[in-house]
């Protein structure tokens, strides 16, 4: 039995050896022997079809007169697949979107692992960027969608969008700029109040349980700042569509940790009452530790600072590099600490390096090129070990720094581009539709638009309309 019905335009022998495929307007004639070397799941299903209905489940159309199978897919992506069949190498083209190319590979039944290493790294990096964009705090699609819905639900969505623009986007207008300026001012006032609360005279009054006008003024100042931060946190929670995602956001967790100490100390003071001094004394250390968390207010500046957001994004993306840096440091520390202890304690009779754990501190300080000078090797073997540890620290810490620097530059450029799109709503809408339009855009372009496929595949292409 033939793999598919006999057509008037094709011969049975030719059909048994070759298959003619039309992908997005470009025709290619493939040999089944090439598919045997690198099988495509969809074309293998095509060969196994026994009737016209089975063919239409695999391809989009079938031309009986030409014995030709039509697929309404991207011709640029399929050109790379033809290069795989001819040369045995699958490369990611620079023209099409990387995510659209991944979808094409899934359609034709090709494993992503067949990509060359450099192309696979590029694809994985693009997938990570897309995942981070989807998990971002602002949903650009919801922001840019026109609010024309009628009724209470439409008015609620419009109100949320306006509130989101004021709270999260300083470039949305005068209200957003004023809100950002007030928020930054309160952060600065909180930092100044935290510094003043550590002055010796105010700390002495706190320990004696007294409340001078200075102490009372600082308490009022802190109360006003906490009230503003609580109000801002409430506004951000109201404009969030998903409360669980809002509470899981890192900056919102920092806000909760910064606000919690004030309310805990206030509740303990109210619960203790006038005669509850013993309860306050027992909880004094805990309260002081909790109040130290007020320094987290400074992290709120990340909402309004592009550099701080870039730093946080870099730390999240370079978690593996930071772990590698820590591993290098620990291995070198475990190597040089016993050596300097042996050289100084046993040979030089120095008491500074009393034990190997005490030498760990010296090893860390030396490899990071800080050099406090509290522990200094005096003997010649100890100085040789010190020189080796310093040089090793410089080399080991330089390896991951290059990758971290490039990641920071890329993160800063991406966030700056997002900020510019947020400042102009119309370009933002066009940019948001770019990723979804890229896959369909490729179908309207010829294979020559990519211009970077393997030249060995050019001989397989035949233009439609002979």
UniProtKB/Swiss-Prot annotation:
CDD domains recorded: BTB_POZ_Kv6_KCNG (cd18382)
Regions that enter the bilayer but do not cross it: 357-368, 369-376
Role played: Regulatory alpha-subunit of the voltage-gated potassium (Kv) channel which, when coassembled with KCNB1, can modulate the kinetics and conductance-voltage relationship. Modulates channel activity by shifting the threshold and the half-maximal activation to more negative values. Potassium channel subunit that does not form functional channels by itself.
Subunit description: Heterodimer with KCNB1.
Domain of life: Eukaryota
Segments on the Extracellular side according to the record's topology features: 197-217, 272-283, 342-356, 377-383
MF term (GO), any: potassium channel regulator activity
Motif placement: Selectivity filter: 369-374
TM segment ranges: 175-196, 218-239, 251-271, 284-304, 320-341, 384-412
Gene3D superfamilies with a match to the protein in the record: 1.10.287.70, Potassium Channel Kv1.1, Chain A (3.30.710.10), Voltage-gated potassium channels. Chain C (1.20.120.350)
Tissue: Highly expressed in heart, liver, skeletal muscle, kidney and pancreas. Detected at low levels in brain, lung and placenta.
Misc. comment: Heterodimers with KCNB1 are highly sensitive to inhibition by tetraethylammonium (TEA) and propafenone.
Keyword Transport: yes
InterPro entries in alphabetical order: BTB/POZ_dom, Ion_trans_dom, K_chnl_volt-dep_Kv, K_chnl_volt-dep_Kv6, SKP1/BTB/POZ_sf, T1-type_BTB, VG_K_chnl, Volt_channel_dom_sf
Main location, first listed in the record: membrane
Organism from which the protein derives: Homo sapiens
Topology within the bilayer: Multi-pass membrane protein
Family per similarity comment: Belongs to the potassium channel family. G (TC 1.A.1.2) subfamily. Kv6.2/KCNG2 sub-subfamily.
Keywords assigned: Cell membrane, Ion channel, Ion transport, Membrane, Potassium, Potassium channel, Potassium transport, Transmembrane, Transmembrane helix, Transport, Voltage-gated channel
Biological process according to GO: action potential; potassium ion transmembrane transport; protein homooligomerization; regulation of potassium ion transport
Name of the protein this chain belongs to: Voltage-gated potassium channel regulatory subunit KCNG2
Cytoplasmic-side segments: 1-174, 240-250, 305-319, 413-466
Region annotated Disordered, chain positions: 131-155, 416-466
């Amino acid at each position: 039995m033939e793999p598919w019905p006999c057509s008037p335009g094709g011969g049975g022998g030719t059909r048994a050896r070759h298959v003619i495929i039309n992908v997005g307007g470009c025709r290619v004639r493939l040999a089944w022997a090439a598919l045997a070397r690198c099988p495509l799941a969809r074309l293998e299903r095509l060969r196994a079809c026994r009737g016209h209905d089975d063919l239409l489940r695999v391809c989009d159309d079938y031309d009986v007169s030409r014995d030709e199978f039509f697929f309404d897919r991207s011709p640029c992506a399929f050109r790379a697949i033809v290069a795989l069949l001819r040369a045995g190498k699958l490369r990611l083209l620079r023209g099409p979107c990387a995510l659209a190319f991944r979808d094409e590979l899934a359609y034709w039944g090709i494993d992503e692992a067949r990509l060359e290493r450099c192309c696979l790294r590029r694809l994985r990096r693009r997938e990570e960027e897309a995942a981070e964009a989807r998990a971002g705090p602002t949903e650009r699609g919801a922001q840019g969608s026109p609010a024309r819905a009628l009724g209470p639900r439409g008015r609620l969505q419009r109100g949320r969008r306006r509130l989101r623009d004021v709270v999260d986007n300083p470039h949305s207008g005068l209200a957003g700029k004023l809100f950002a300026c007030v928020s930054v001012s309160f952060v600065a006032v909180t930092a100044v109040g935290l510094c003043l609360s550590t002055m010796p005279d105010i700390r002495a009054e706190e320990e004696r349980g007294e409340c001078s006008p200075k102490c009372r003024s600082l308490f009022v100042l802190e109360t006003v700042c906490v009230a503003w931060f609580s109000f801002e946190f409430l506004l951000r929670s109201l404009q969030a569509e998903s409360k669980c995602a809002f509470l899981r956001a890192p900056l919102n967790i920092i806000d909760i940790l910064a606000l919690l100490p004030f309310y805990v100390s206030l509740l303990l003071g109210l619960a203790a009452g006038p005669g509850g001094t013993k309860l306050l004394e027992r909880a004094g250390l805990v309260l002081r530790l909790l109040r130290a968390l007020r320094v987290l207010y400074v992290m709120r500046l990340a909402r309004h600072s592009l550099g701080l957001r870039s730093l946080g994004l870099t730390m999240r993306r370079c978690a593996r590099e930071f772990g590698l840096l820590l591993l290098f440091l620990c291995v070198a520390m475990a190597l040089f600490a016993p050596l300097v202890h042996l050289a100084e304690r046993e040979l030089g009779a120095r008491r500074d390096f009393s034990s190997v754990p005490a030498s760990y501190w010296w090893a860390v300080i030396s490899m990071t090129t800080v050099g406090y000078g509290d522990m200094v090797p005096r003997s010649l073997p100890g100085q040789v070990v010190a020189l080796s540890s310093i040089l090793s620290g410089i080399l080991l810490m330089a390896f991951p720094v290059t990758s971290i620097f490039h990641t920071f530059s890329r993160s800063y450029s991406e966030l700056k581009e997002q900020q510019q799109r947020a400042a102009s709503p119309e370009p933002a809408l066009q940019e948001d539709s770019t990723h979804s339009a890229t896959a369909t855009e490729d179908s309207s372009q010829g294979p020559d638009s990519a211009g970077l496929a393997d030249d060995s595949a050019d001989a397989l292409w035949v233009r439609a309309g002979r």
